[in-house]
Amino acid sequence: MKKVLVLHGINLNMFGKRDPAHYGTTTLKEIDARISEWAAELGFEVECFQTNHEGEMASRIHAAHEENVDAVVINAGAWTHYSYGIADALAILKAPIVEVHMSNIHAREEFRHHSVIAGLAKGQICGFGVDSYHLGLIAASNLIKVEN
């Protein structure tokens, strides 16, 4: 069975508590449950991983390379805008990458408009709340089908 790795970056463990105007009230645990349901509907295995530690995220990405995951969906949180370490780790992957954000990063503060990940990703989905993850999984599923 194909496997998609969903990566949640820094501060995303605070979904449901942090800035509900931008991120809503759904918790990360609830988001992960929905992700599992959507993945089952799309016919692939999914693993969700969240950390607030950049080195741990890089290590999980390195492990994904060794595991030959079929696709990665990533919401790197604030790391999106400045973490060249995360970007360098993602560049190692052979699997397609889909970047997602719950809020529309292009309609927010200027510093959020730039993504160091975007150039590595097949595409970026943002601004649709929790549905950004669903759309990201659909994109990942389609990319897996195209690349195999």
UniProtKB/Swiss-Prot annotation:
Active site: 23, 101
Residues given in the record as substrate binding sites: 75, 81, 88, 102-103, 112
Catalytic activity: 3-dehydroquinate = 3-dehydroshikimate + H2O
Record's keyword terms, sorted: Amino-acid biosynthesis, Aromatic amino acid biosynthesis, Lyase
Pathway noted in the entry: Metabolic intermediate biosynthesis; chorismate biosynthesis; chorismate from D-erythrose 4-phosphate and phosphoenolpyruvate: step 3/7
Residues flagged as site, Transition state stabilizer: 18
Enzyme Commission number(s) from the entry: 4.2.1.10
MF annotations from Gene Ontology: 3-dehydroquinate dehydratase activity
Subunit structure: Homododecamer.
Protein name: 3-dehydroquinate dehydratase
Organism: Syntrophotalea carbinolica (strain DSM 2380 / NBRC 103641 / GraBd1)
